[in-house]
């Protein structure tokens, strides 16, 4: 008889849907340990604008994979999968259940399905690409990527040389586009996963929550946090960190491209668009149990029952 795989829980949902509150409540009942699945919460010094769990929340339920990088650094889905698997295994060794909480669907997908191994970096080809960029400009190289891999070109900004260079490098090494390779599934997740998504039933309620949260972030000092980042000479608006929702709009304000009120409005609109994309992902997700943001008690009971029934089946 083969040994049963360990249990892991996914708690997904759009931004401002109440994931953190629900996860903390669950940890107070069961031996779960939280792992953040959020491409913005990884950055140090970006606390208010990302709605990062505060000190009290972190004391109640410490989150792994928060504050692990400086905003100058990039982080891929492959990096996340590596770090999340390591954290999940540590939690299981402690006799507890990994609870993965967040809204970065690409990270959840990479963790669940695995990633096709990409070719290793080739210094000679990378140098060749950098030389071409010096003579032609990155915009010309972006046009080249658009021809061979329009999907990646749509995701990668012309002023993001690190990711643009890597996409071209992968194609020149392997003869396959980054999109082709990343769509190929890799090693599956060695866990029994129960998957949940939380969201309000009505879109208007989610919009209300998003606007309220943005207002609270401004009251908490988001502008001051943004100014501290803006004064750093090593940060610019084409970095993945500064492209995070809210931060890009506030950067435009500090650059003098719009008023503060306009930046807030654009930030709220961008957050709504993000939430719409997250819900679109989730609607096509298999084996998903939906929870209601407006009924946290019932959502907590549903999660609790899932853990209890799993324990009973293992006896």
From Swiss-Prot:
<comment type="function">
    <text>Catalyzes the transfer of a dimethylallyl group onto the adenine at position 37 in tRNAs that read codons beginning with uridine, leading to the formation of N6-(dimethylallyl)adenosine (i(6)A).</text>
</comment>
<keyword id="KW-0819">tRNA processing</keyword>
<dbReference type="InterPro" id="IPR027417">
    <property type="entry name" value="P-loop_NTPase"/>
</dbReference>
<feature type="region of interest" description="Interaction with substrate tRNA">
    <location>
        <begin position="243"/>
        <end position="248"/>
    </location>
</feature>
<protein>
    <recommendedName>
        <fullName>tRNA dimethylallyltransferase</fullName>
        <ecNumber>2.5.1.75</ecNumber>
    </recommendedName>
</protein>
<dbReference type="GO" id="GO:0052381">
    <property type="term" value="F:tRNA dimethylallyltransferase activity"/>
</dbReference>
<feature type="binding site">
    <location>
        <begin position="15"/>
        <end position="20"/>
    </location>
    <ligand>
        <name>substrate</name>
    </ligand>
</feature>
<keyword id="KW-0460">Magnesium</keyword>
<dbReference type="GO" id="GO:0006400">
    <property type="term" value="P:tRNA modification"/>
</dbReference>
<comment type="subunit">
    <text>Monomer.</text>
</comment>
<keyword id="KW-0808">Transferase</keyword>
<dbReference type="InterPro" id="IPR039657">
    <property type="entry name" value="Dimethylallyltransferase"/>
</dbReference>
<feature type="site" description="Interaction with substrate tRNA">
    <location>
        <position position="126"/>
    </location>
</feature>
<feature type="binding site">
    <location>
        <begin position="13"/>
        <end position="20"/>
    </location>
    <ligand>
        <name>ATP</name>
    </ligand>
</feature>
<keyword id="KW-0067">ATP-binding</keyword>
<feature type="site" description="Interaction with substrate tRNA">
    <location>
        <position position="104"/>
    </location>
</feature>
<feature type="region of interest" description="Interaction with substrate tRNA">
    <location>
        <begin position="38"/>
        <end position="41"/>
    </location>
</feature>
<keyword id="KW-0547">Nucleotide-binding</keyword>
<comment type="similarity">
    <text>Belongs to the IPP transferase family.</text>
</comment>
<dbReference type="Pfam" id="PF01715">
    <property type="entry name" value="IPPT"/>
</dbReference>
<dbReference type="InterPro" id="IPR018022">
    <property type="entry name" value="IPT"/>
</dbReference>
<feature type="region of interest" description="Interaction with substrate tRNA">
    <location>
        <begin position="276"/>
        <end position="283"/>
    </location>
</feature>
<feature type="region of interest" description="Interaction with substrate tRNA">
    <location>
        <begin position="162"/>
        <end position="166"/>
    </location>
</feature>
<dbReference type="GO" id="GO:0005524">
    <property type="term" value="F:ATP binding"/>
</dbReference>
């Amino acid at each position: 008889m083969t040994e049963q795989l360990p249990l892991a829980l996914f708690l997904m949902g759009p931004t401002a849907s109440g994931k953190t509150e629900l996860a903390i409540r669950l940890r107070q009942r069961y031996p779960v340990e939280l792992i953040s699945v959020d491409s913005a919460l990884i950055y140090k010094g970006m606390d208010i604008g990302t709605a990062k769990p505060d000190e009290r929340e972190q004391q109640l339920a410490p989150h792994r994979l928060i504050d692990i990088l400086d905003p100058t650094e990039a982080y891929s889905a492959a990096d996340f999968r590596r770090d999340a698997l390591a954290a999940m295994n540590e939690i299981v060794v402690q006799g507890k259940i990994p609870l993965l909480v967040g809204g970065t669907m690409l990270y959840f997908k990479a963790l669940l399905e695995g990633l096709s191994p990409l070719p290793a970096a080739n210094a000679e080809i990378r140098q060749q690409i950098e030389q071409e960029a010096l003579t032609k400009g990155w915009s010309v190289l972006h046009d080249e990527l658009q021809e061979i891999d329009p999907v990646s070109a749509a995701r990668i900004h012309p002023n993001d040389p690190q990711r643009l260079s890597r996409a071209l490098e992968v194609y020149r090494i392997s003869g396959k586009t980054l999109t082709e390779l990343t769509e190929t599934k890799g090693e599956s997740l060695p866990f029994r996963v129960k998957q949940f998504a939380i969201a309000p039933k009505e879109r208007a309620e989610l919009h209300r929550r998003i606007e309220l949260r943005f207002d609270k972030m401004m009251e908490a000092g988001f502008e001051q946090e943004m100014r501290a980042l803006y004064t750093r000479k090593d940060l610019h608006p084409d970095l993945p960190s500064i492209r995070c929702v809210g931060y890009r709009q506030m950067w435009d304000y500090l650059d003098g491209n719009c008023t503060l009120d306009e930046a807030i409005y654009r930030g709220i609109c961008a957050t709504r668009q993000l939430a719409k994309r997250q819900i679109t992902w989730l609607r096509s997700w298999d084996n998903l149990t939906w929870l209601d943001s407006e009924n946290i008690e019932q959502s907590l009971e549903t999660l609790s029952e899932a853990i209890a029934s799993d324990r009973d089946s293992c006896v």
